[in-house]
Design a protein with these regions (language model features):
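SAM-dependent methyltransferases
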Residues: 99-146
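Fold-independent oxyanion-binding glycine-rich loops
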Residues: 2-5, 27-30, 49, 56, ...
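Short glycine- and Lys/Arg-enriched binding-loop motifs that mark or flank ligand-binding interfaces
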Residues: 24, 45, 51-52, 100, ...
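Internal, active-site/partner-interface "lid" segment
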Residues: 58, 70-109
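Structured adenosyl-cofactor binding patch, chiefly the S-adenosyl-L-methionine
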Residues: 33, 37-84
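S-adenosyl-L-methionine/SAH cofactor-binding core of RNA-modifying enzymes
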Residues: 1-29
Length: 146
């Protein structure tokens, strides 16, 4: 049941739920669902954030997308998940596309170098800097794991 009273949906919970064989979603509307249902059934309450929506349908889209994309074969390359935000308590590094120069801003030279080791180190340092600056809570978790 998607509820602001529930456990917060994060990447770890999404991973855990992606391994379940079946998931049923109860979408409340305005005030929620009858409390007796929650008390008499084995229902896990899950929150997608600290805000209120008119109904659980919108929240269910977020919930489902977070889980479904982790299923084998849904993404073209399952290894791509490893570098995404939250996988190692870090936010993802900046992304760049073509053209190489756009509005006087260029793609960093290291990304054009072809040196996979340098690119890997650049991505890690960027992820660390972004996380440290924008999400001190994640940075703290990362430093503990490291």
């Amino acid at each position: 049941y998607l509820s602001p009273k529930g456990k917060s949906l994060d990447q770890g919970l999404a991973k855990s739920l992606s391994k379940e064989e079946n998931i049923n979603i109860i979408c409340g509307h305005f005030e929620g669902v009858d409390q007796r249902l929650l008390e008499t059934r084995n229902i896990q309450e899950i929150s997608i954030g600290d805000y209120i929506l008119s109904g659980g349908e919108t929240a269910s889209y977020v919930f489902l997308d977070a889980i479904i994309r982790l299923l084998p074969g849904v993404l073209g390359n399952n290894l791509s998940i490893q570098d995404e935000s939250f996988e190692n308590s870090l936010l993802e590094y900046p992304q760049f596309t073509k053209p190489q120069k756009w509005e006087e801003k260029s793609v960093p030279d290291v990304l054009l170098s072809g040196d996979h080791n340098k690119i890997k180190h650049w991505r890690l340092s960027q992820s660390e800097a972004i996380t440290r600056r924008q999400r001190p809570d994640l940075w703290k978790k990362y430093k503990i794991k490291k």
